[in-house]
Amino acid sequence: MAIQAEEISALIKQQLEKFDTTLTVEEVGTVTYVGDGVARATGLANALAGELVEFANGTYGMAQNLESSEVGIIILGGFDDIREGDTVKRTGRIMEVPVGEQLIGRVVNALGQPIDGLGEIKTDKTRPVEVKAPGVMERKSVSEPLQTGIKAIDALVPIGRGQRELIIGDRKTGKTSLAIDTILNQKDQNMIVIYVAIGQKNSTVRAQVETLRQMGAMDYTIVVNAGPSEPAPMLYLAPYVGAAMGEEFMYNGKHVLIVYDDLSKQATAYRELSLILRRPPGREAYPGDVFYLHSRLLERAAKLSDELGGGSMTALPFIETQAGDVSAYIPTNVISITDGQVFLDADQFYAGVRPAIDAGTSVSRVGGDAQIKAMKKVAGTLRLDLASFRELESFAQFGSDLDSATQAKLARGRRTVEILKQPLNKPMPVQHQVVVLYALTHGYLDDVEVADIQRFQDELIAYVDANASELFKAIVETKNLPEEADLNAAIEAFKAGFAGSESAE
């Protein structure tokens, strides 16, 4: 069969119409060095700071150092199969992570990828890891309380929604336990929690996730884990990834609590990266912008204005001190960035005072405005009383001839210390705290043996719950103290039937 010339020309025209003249231009460079989570490459003259680049094996990196002849890149993942001479190309994008409701209840790595074996996370929403913090006019002053369920914090150093409260102390003084108890207490509080574990042992994180799961707290919690065996870029990025996930909820009018456990390890990872990138070292070999590393992260926690939906993100950054030295470089930096700090004292911890909160050095700069009226009334002078008790106690060791007023102060102080002790994973609702602290500050515990204080507290709560539950209800609904006569009557009625042990103090 002969092919007609018209058919041939029609086919050629058809093919020409389909011909795509668009060119894909990619800027490709060459890797000149790779090691310890960092690569250097030439040929990426137009790369942007923080831009994602892609290596030949599909691994991504982030451009950090933009020099005249080469670019310093931090590698986001394993770097064992990246070789000198490999190609690396620009993507024109900045790093983004998956965000949204689908992440709740999951454990993810510093790239937002699931690591809990529960399958992929089906979300099509992403947010940039690095964003500008809300400005002054986009914020509102902190006014709503964030109840931690820990008496010593809610009474002495209250935290408000949108605040940044530093938890600082030596290793093994109960920092993470404070965070876990606070997370457990957010049940039914309309709060989403993001727990960012930076450089924590994987076995420890696993145990914490199991605790949260057993207590039903994973229903509102996202865990971001960057383990100690992961490359330094992952430890550096994990807090920003957690903040991006939190911002998605905050900008949608929800309330978020984010725990960074702990930022000392992030600073160490950043120091490692900076030294390998050959940035000039400063004090304690940290780079000059280590303050900015933490300030740009913590400024992202905010209470948004009503125009932006009134959402909030409360940050609890952790810093580990060496032998209680809060005047080291990173601790002083973070203290100056945050709105107060809870200082955990190793001596108190080993003396059995747990949580080991040092009332003298702990402070909350904005949380007082967020405290409910009932708590303000019962805990007004508690922090000062406790600090003066510590001073008196050390003074009283030198002599026994103390006047009756001093002895009464010491006796009240011992009972205050005892009442503020709390077992692990047992956060206390604020209405229970108010009644217990009311009993303390109004002298109802002055004649109760110190050894009986914890039992007195538990039995008092049970008694009020059974016989005068309207008192608890009134505190919850009005946020104020109920009628003092009713409160006094309930405590006196309970006390009349309380059987104290006979052991002397």
Curated annotation (Swiss-Prot):
Catalytic reactions on record: ATP + H2O + 4 H(+)(in) = ADP + phosphate + 5 H(+)(out)
Source superkingdom: Bacteria
Membrane topology: Peripheral membrane protein
Presence of keyword Ion transport: yes
Residues the record marks as site: Required for activity: S362
Residue sites binding ATP per the record: G169, D170, R171, K172, T173, G174, K175, T176
Assigned EC number: 7.1.2.2
Name of the top EC class for this enzyme: translocase
Family under the similarity heading: Belongs to the ATPase alpha/beta chains family.
Subunit (UniProt): F-type ATPases have 2 components, CF(1) - the catalytic core - and CF(0) - the membrane proton channel. CF(1) has five subunits: alpha(3), beta(3), gamma(1), delta(1), epsilon(1). CF(0) has three main subunits: a(1), b(2) and c(9-12). The alpha and beta chains form an alternating ring which encloses part of the gamma chain. CF(1) is attached to CF(0) by a central stalk formed by the gamma and epsilon chains, while a peripheral stalk is formed by the delta and b chains.
Protein name listed in UniProt: ATP synthase subunit alpha
Organism: Leuconostoc mesenteroides subsp. mesenteroides (strain ATCC 8293 / DSM 20343 / BCRC 11652 / CCM 1803 / JCM 6124 / NCDO 523 / NBRC 100496 / NCIMB 8023 / NCTC 12954 / NRRL B-1118 / 37Y)
Encoding gene (name): atpA
